[in-house]
Amino acid sequence: MAPVGGGGRPVGGPARGRLLLAAPVLLVLLWALGARGQGSPQQGTIVGMRLASCNKSCGTNPDGIIFVSEGSTVNLRLYGYSLGNISSNLISFTEVDDAETLHKSTSCLELTKDLVVQQLVNVSRGNTSGVLVVLTKFLRRSESMKLYALCTRAQPDGPWLKWTDKDSLLFMVEEPGRFLPLWLHILLITVLLVLSGIFSGLNLGLMALDPMELRIVQNCGTEKERRYARKIEPIRRKGNYLLCSLLLGNVLVNTSLTILLDNLIGSGLMAVASSTIGIVIFGEILPQALCSRHGLAVGANTILLTKFFMLLTFPLSFPISKLLDFFLGQEIRTVYNREKLMEMLKVTEPYNDLVKEELNMIQGALELRTKTVEDIMTQLQDCFMIRSDAILDFNTMSEIMESGYTRIPVFEDEQSNIVDILYVKDLAFVDPDDCTPLKTITRFYNHPVHFVFHDTKLDAMLEEFKKGKSHLAIVQKVNNEGEGDPFYEVLGLVTLEDVIEEIIKSEILDESDMYTDNRSRKRVSEKNKRDFSAFKDADNELKVKISPQLLLAAHRFLATEVSQFSPSLISEKILLRLLKYPDVIQELKFDEHNKYYARHYLYTRNKPADYFILILQGKVEVEAGKENMKFETGAFSYYGTMALTSVPSDRSPAHPTPLSRSASLSYPDRTDVSTAATLAGSSNQFGSSVLGQYISDFSVRALVDLQYIKITRQQYQNGLLASRMENSPQFPIDGCTTHMENLAEKSELPVVDETTTLLNERNSLLHKASHENAI
């Protein structure tokens, strides 16, 4: 180690040498910065400048020189030190010839007035950057551009120094002029915007109109719609050509609109935003919303404009359309199959004018080819059928009539073996009393039996029925299950009515139907059903032999022709039981040797009678009037209606009431207990007092054997009361209830029920004996 203070280089020699070399360089740099900024950092120094923004066209050219438009406001970003100490009067610009002569001089001999420095704003916290606002004036007409350089000074009264680098240069160029007057510019933009909307709307409206739909409108639309469709349909057939023309026109108009807006506004961003908003709102949304709802009317009224643009774009759009036709084929038109058509009708039901029944019929007709007879047939076990060995007596014919069917299958041995068809009209000349065998009728008419297979479609079945062979068919299928040979198995019946019901989707009911639906077996209301079995004489109630047909005729005649027996007074059920009561239907054998025998007289003049008579068979002589006029009558003539409702002259004071018996029965709605008491009391009087009986003023004498109906007043009144009991089983009086037992206690009339009240044998025999004694 060397001694201290010995010879050699001083400690740190190399480092100290480098520091001594760097010191002069640092001084030179600081001097240069001071000379460029014309002041110390405390006075403010500008290091650089670049373009921040402007309100017109501006930017930087490829050489890095800033260019701005005349008559604009330019914001320049300045960088340096202590920029907050720099005021606007320390910054200016001078005009230079070109960038090459910029270095020849550093002094600003003449400041320009074309650039006006406003102020320095937005200075940063460190005073290292700020924005200089500069206003550019308009160039002279002979000038298209000028070049300016930045000039600065350190003091307000100091000399101006010019910057000599390209960063300090500023080009001011002439503002691009409009190639059209302002009013024409705006008018052209408006026209293009309207055309853009028309093309966009027609593109949606016309292309949405299907050629098939246009043909439909031509045939079934309104007069105006037909006229519109006739105008549009020829050009709509050329779908691709029309599409290309509309799209080319739309693109051309939108492009031109954007260029005009850019020229009018002068800013690229604003032009793009304005054209986008205008095209979207006025060129797309509004016209498409309008044409989607009124495409037919808009397309017809703009047909000339459409044809014009088709002609204008023909050189380009027509070849393109042919290429589309070649590669894509012809336009696919809307065609609805059965399922789509049915679904369309269902979906549009709230908007069309079809009622539900019409919609059901259309749906049923469309489903005709998809359903089979097995879907609508009546199962064999639910069919009404008749044996081939049946006898057509009253019971059998009543059963046939009660079934309500007009075509009845005839089977032999078992129901699946159907051999004939019986039509109800075949029985028109058949007398039930003859007990004709059914085979006699079926062999005489020999109606063909029509068989169909279970998978037969309903449209084919309808065609078979239309041929008139039969309106009823037997449904069968080939049963090849199990061992043995296949055989035909009968499944059920199908009729023309079943097919029609399936078409109209509703049940057809007439007065003879028993079921609303053969498949659901829902029965029809039986309020109109006639029970022919009630006229059978199997119970031997009638002592006089009378045919069920004559009994039925007498019942209907009394109920409809004789007001005293109308259903409003006596129910049909009570009337029928009254007719079947013993001694109501009587016979009289005529004695040829004693024509004026007393028993031949049904009525004798001036003698009391309390009965009504209806002639069923035979002939009588009637003598009436002071002149003793005589005339003959026959079947279904009747006498003594007044005897049924006459009022007794000696009413018992024990039953004071203002309402007589006959009057109360004339108004069945009134149910006063006093009336009931009057009925009971009057009944006893009629049975015992001759003075209360009807006195006939005519005579009726039999001329031949007679069969007639004889109804006494007692029976008639009991029938009235029974009918009232049937509708109202209790008589209310002053909020209380009088039962039938109490009514029986007040009179000799037995307890009123459906049997004893209507037909009291003891009273009937009493009246009969009284009548014979009176005669």
From Swiss-Prot:
Where, subcellularly, is it found? Cell membrane
Tell me the membrane topology, using the record's own terms. Multi-pass membrane protein
- Transmembrane region(s): 179-199, 265-285, 294-316
Q: Which residues lie on this side of the membrane: Cytoplasmic?
A: 200-240, 262-264, 317-775
Protein's UniProt keywords contain Transport: yes
Q: Which residues form the signal peptide?
A: none
What does the record give under GO molecular function? magnesium ion transmembrane transporter activity; sodium ion transmembrane transporter activity
**Per its UniProt record, what CDD domains does this chain match?**
CBS_pair_CorC_HlyC_assoc
* Gene Ontology cellular component list: basolateral plasma membrane; plasma membrane; protein-containing complex
Q: Which residues are glycosylated?
A: 85, 122
Summarize the disease involvement recorded for this protein: Jalili syndrome: A syndrome characterized by the association of cone-rod dystrophy and amelogenesis imperfecta.
Question: What does the sequence similarity comment in the record state about its family?
Answer: Belongs to the ACDP family.
- Indicate the quaternary assembly: Interacts with COX11.
Instruction: Summarize the protein's role.
Output: Probable metal transporter. The interaction with the metal ion chaperone COX11 suggests that it may play a role in sensory neuron functions. May play a role in biomineralization and retinal function.
The name of this protein is Metal transporter CNNM4
Source species: Homo sapiens
